[in-house]
């Protein structure tokens, strides 16, 4: 299966963060520590540590900013990659990362035979948290996630980008213990694409017979049909993910086929054959209303994000919930690249009017604090950087997590 690789804070606070972390692309090359330990560095400040994730792009390493003592994530891609995407992804992050819910990007440059992008280190993904909660989320948790992610996707779309990679692994909470810990972040823009032509300023044309881009479990029906993706497809994929969280699984999971192509065909056929009413049965009508709306959108049409958000905020209020960031995983020990964290119960968000409550999150920062003597970035730089397997990306095999997923007892349920 071919995959198309084409691609809250004010200015003062943002400036402080930039000056503190030394962000922006640098012309500095890679330098070693100059010691016998052979410490691998990215740029002048970032020490490369242990492997914490992998994907078709290459791999992800834990890193440390030696100037600020903050942990970071370092994404590595072979310079001679057959489908290089990291520099384009860096450019997209630069377009997006001045807002809440998108990780800060600190640096892009060479690292030996690799390109390296240094990012803010975040917490567990929604898929990891889903596992932690026995693979079902309550309605309250799903609505708090949905309200935030509609806002995230709207922001991405306002920057002339479509995301095209909706899956729980690509939405992460902030670092446990930080002010960002309750905010849902969107990561991995390796499959993102400009839907507004930067030259003509016009919407990209409608096309058919496109190769599949994304994760088959969540992608829109039109994507299965080979149609060019636009804003509507991101929102439909989100709707499928919301139902996955509520139901625990989707009707098109676990399908068997002799080839990947046949399997994707079966997944698409089952999606089309599953009425929205059946998919959303026993759940609030708003879930079905959401999916009906996004599936009826025209290719060129701008979605009414306020309408979709209001669907869920009204349901949230009628259900008597409080937007207190008390997710289903609150109080559970959370895995991180630097050890398990036992988070405190989240405090009440600052008082604000009702309209703000459901469209903005708490003010965030990314300070990680001083490192202890058991620094997980120390002593790992000499570990070889594994080249990505020479295979095409396929369905759930695409992975770009901000820390290594734990192995599961059974892979069947994830098909």
UniProtKB/Swiss-Prot annotation:
Which UniProt keyword terms apply here?
A: ATP-binding, Cytoplasm, Kinase, Nucleotide-binding, Phosphoprotein, Serine/threonine-protein kinase, Transferase, Wnt signaling pathway
Question: Where along this sequence does the record place binding of ATP?
Answer: 52-60, 75
Could you say how this protein's activity is regulated?
A: Stimulated by estrogen.
Q: Where in the sequence does UniProt note compositional bias of the Polar residues kind?
A: 20-38
Q: How is it modified after translation?
A: Autophosphorylated. Phosphorylated by aPKC which promotes dissociation from the cell cortex.
Its cellular-component GO annotations read: cell cortex
Region (Phospho-regulated basic and hydrophobic (PRBH) motif) residue ranges read 369-415
What protein name applies here? Answer: Casein kinase I isoform gamma-2
